[in-house]
Amino acid sequence: MKAVVFAYHNIGCAAVRSLLEAGVEIAAVFTHVDDSNENVFFESVAKLAARNGIPVFAPEDVNHPLWVEKIRQMQPDSIFSFYYRHMLSQEILDIAPKGGFNLHGSLLPNYRGRAPINWVLVNGETETGMTLHTMTVKPDAGAIVAQEALAITDADTAATLHSRMTHLAGELLNKVIPQIVAGTHSLTEQDTTKASYFGRRTPADGEIKWANDSRTIFNLIRAVTEPFPGAFSYLGERRVTIWGATASEKTYDVTPGTIVETKPLTVACAQGSIVLHSGQAENGLYLSGDQLAAEMYLVEGMRFGPQASAVIAATRRQKVLIMGANGFIGNHLTKRLLDDGKYEIYAMDMSSSQIEQHLSHPDFHFVEGDITIHNEWIEYHIKKCDIVLPLVAIATPIEYTRNPLRVFELDFEENLKIVRACVKYDKRIIFPSTSEVYGMCTDEEFDEDTSPLITGPINRQRWIYSTSKQLLDRVIWAYGKKDNLKFTLFRPFNWMGPRLDSLNSARVGSSRAITQLILNLVEGTPIKLIDGGEQKRCFTDISEAIEALFRVIENKDGLCDGQIINIGSPDNEASIKVMAETLVEKFEEHPLRDQFPPFAGYNLVESQSFYGDGYQDVQHRRPSIKNAKKLLNWEPTIMMDQTIEDTLDFFLKTAVEETK
């Protein structure tokens, strides 16, 4: 049998040896270039392959068509993956007639995902094992070929368990590889109801929470000890890594984290205590617990805990700079941040009509100004604040053809200055991209990470807005890669609600669709349906959209860093015509209905006559919100009818007030 192997780490080496011992012809080994930032404590798959005369490769993207074709030319019967760190595409899996097989370090379906050896120790499991399973595009989900269990003892650490699992991998494969070669192996589907999934671990996950019980802390320490970065805690600003410890049931009536003895060095937990056997001060030597206490001058009553500066930073209210605070997104976001009470807002806009109620708030500092003029004020406040939201843009479709250069100057050039200032002062920017960047994409749902961004020809000037935003997205992404700019791009999909533009802006034709339609009802003029209103959009309630944006600002666990997030409601898809009909229905039922003229009907209008030359429309715009679900734990629930009702109510009451 001929195989192509994807392998890394000690377990990868053990697996390659098992294949060779079984007489499998290995056409090539794909592995990884060792990361200089990683503690490379493990054996080299590349060296093992080279010593056995096996061609070895380490491509950046093994799923690239060039590599797929190269693998196809090798004509493997089977594909094996042994602790290879990248997913293989379906194209690669389809090459091998006998299929693909992956070795996973747990008893599947438990502990699918990353770092299972560390996770089972963290969670205090008493058993783990090795599983060989068929490969599917979904990670660790294929049918089980063979499985061996392994008991976990209190003496196990990440190092010892990894060594034992490496040995187990060899034993398992020595039994099952001959069966695969002979075609006599069996398959058992996984019970998905018992599946659990765990993500990657980072060094930051090793911070000790002393409010846990001693057993939980002991499990963390042994799960991330050498050769991994280690569990750690702080004494003020002094970081201490704890390499070895035991759990004691003895409980002390003190605050968790308090040093209660120095010989042996003992720290109180919420329940029980931890006896430290070995540790290391930052930039210090690996020492016994007792010597560590002596050399760091530790005494009873001192307390381990979070880094002092981090505690201060966590309690300090973050400063947020909002440019365009009087706009639709800006005024709703301002209210949400002030209601939370953890943010201090600095804001600029050319008017304060929508935020007057906040002007006296002690945490709201507003300046009336123009971002094209007040460059020094803006740069000073970017330097002063923690988070920057540049919400100033021309975002009404008629302006794209009426004033294309003005759209470019404001939406791109002025915002580029802000982006560069964020790079200069190392500030986090949350940038409003737009659903318009997807243009005429034909995907059923627009995906932030995979959907193509397709715009029309140059003579269709309506695309200048989309292109300006897309280019800024690309510039921000490049700054993130090159200069470590902290950023999140969010893409609104037809956010709708009270204070979306104004009736006055609708009177001059510079508003979004629903506000324009409400003006028609208020003034008794026909509702204009551009090209019959057949274009479909996914309407999103502003309250839910702002909640998603608020969670982006919160950025729990840094999950939003470097991400693009669609914020929209895919289940609220409707044509402009249906939206208009719903609006008219709500209008006729409204308590203020008798204050306004009779409904004047619908007027079907060609887009060119309404928008002018250079316009081109999009027939559907439906977002994928997988990133919002995963990163923000956000999913919209408010239906379009309710949003239309709330929006209409606001503008009708506003119109009545204006006539008094």
Swiss-Prot record:
The membrane spanning regions, by residue number, are none
Give the UniProt record's GO annotations in the biological process aspect.
Answer: lipid A biosynthetic process; lipopolysaccharide biosynthetic process; response to antibiotic
* Associated pathway: Nucleotide-sugar biosynthesis; UDP-4-deoxy-4-formamido-beta-L-arabinose biosynthesis; UDP-4-deoxy-4-formamido-beta-L-arabinose from UDP-alpha-D-glucuronate: step 1/3; Nucleotide-sugar biosynthesis; UDP-4-deoxy-4-formamido-beta-L-arabinose biosynthesis; UDP-4-deoxy-4-formamido-beta-L-arabinose from UDP-alpha-D-glucuronate: step 3/3; Bacterial outer membrane biogenesis; lipopolysaccharide biosynthesis
Report the catalytic activity. Answer: UDP-alpha-D-glucuronate + NAD(+) = UDP-beta-L-threo-pentopyranos-4-ulose + CO2 + NADH; UDP-4-amino-4-deoxy-beta-L-arabinose + (6R)-10-formyltetrahydrofolate = UDP-4-deoxy-4-formamido-beta-L-arabinose + (6S)-5,6,7,8-tetrahydrofolate + H(+)
Q: Which InterPro entries match?
A: Arna-like_SDR_e, Bifun_polymyxin_resist_ArnA, Epimerase_deHydtase, Formyl_trans_C, Formyl_transf_N, Formyl_transf_N_sf, Formyl_transferase-like_C_sf, Lipid_A_modif_metabolic_enz
Q: Where is this region: Dehydrogenase ArnADH?
A: 316-660
| Feature type site, description Transition state stabilizer | N102
Residue sites binding NAD(+) per the record: D349, D370, I371
Q: Where is this region: Formyltransferase ArnAFT?
A: 1-304
Q: Where does UDP-alpha-D-glucuronate bind?
A: 395, 400, 434-435, 462, 494, 528-537, 615
Residues reported to bind (6R)-10-formyltetrahydrofolate: R114, T136, V137, K138, P139, D140
Where along the chain is the active site annotated? Answer: H104, E436, R621
Subunit details = Homohexamer, formed by a dimer of trimers.
Query: Its biological function?
Result: Bifunctional enzyme that catalyzes the oxidative decarboxylation of UDP-glucuronic acid (UDP-GlcUA) to UDP-4-keto-arabinose (UDP-Ara4O) and the addition of a formyl group to UDP-4-amino-4-deoxy-L-arabinose (UDP-L-Ara4N) to form UDP-L-4-formamido-arabinose (UDP-L-Ara4FN). The modified arabinose is attached to lipid A and is required for resistance to polymyxin and cationic antimicrobial peptides.
Concerning HAMAP family, the annotation shows:
ArnA
What is the recorded name of this protein? Bifunctional polymyxin resistance protein ArnA
